[in-house]
From Swiss-Prot:
Belongs to the UPF0145 family. InterPro entries: UPF0145_dom_sf (IPR035439), UPF0145_YbjQ-like (IPR002765). Pfam families: YbjQ_1. It comes from the Archaea. This is UPF0145 protein TV0671. It comes from Thermoplasma volcanium (strain ATCC 51530 / DSM 4299 / JCM 9571 / NBRC 15438 / GSS1).
Length: 122
């Protein structure tokens, strides 16, 4: 859970110990990034040697984090305290830009009452 925003974000369709009291709907956080000419040249030179291209890995990691922050903001704006079924999608725009979308279902959850007795089978 993100303590700063108090938004629970999970890839599952449920949250252990919580019950969904309201489904708000699909929300998303979108960002588009470009590496820039200098970064593309450095990454291109590194690709000649093979292996990981750390410049692109860092850019994509930062871009995913930005998309997640925007998804959290969207959840707060619609009154959700959780996002279930969190997913990512990406696509290229032209040859120099990458779009990252974080999306999921905004919901309101509350703790499962501890006063419910569980009935076991004998």
């Amino acid at each position: 859970m993100d303590e700063e925003h108090n938004i629970i974000m999970v890839t599952t369709n449920y949250i252990p110990g919580k019950k969904i009291t309201r489904i708000i709907g699909t929300i998303w956080g979108i960002t588009v990034r470009s590496r820039g000419l200098g970064g593309n040249i450095v990454a291109g030179l590194r690709s000649l040697a093979g292996g990981e291209i750390k410049e692109y890995s860092k850019m994509l990691s930062d871009t995913r984090n930005t998309a997640m922050e925007r998804l959290r903001d969207a959840a707060e704006q619609v009154g959700a305290n959780a996002v279930i079924e969190l997913r990512f999608d990406s696509s290229d725009i032209g040859q120099v830009m990458t779009e990252i979308v974080a999306y999921g279902t905004a919901v309101v959850v509350e703790d499962v009452s501890s006063d419910i007795q569980r009935v076991g089978l004998s």
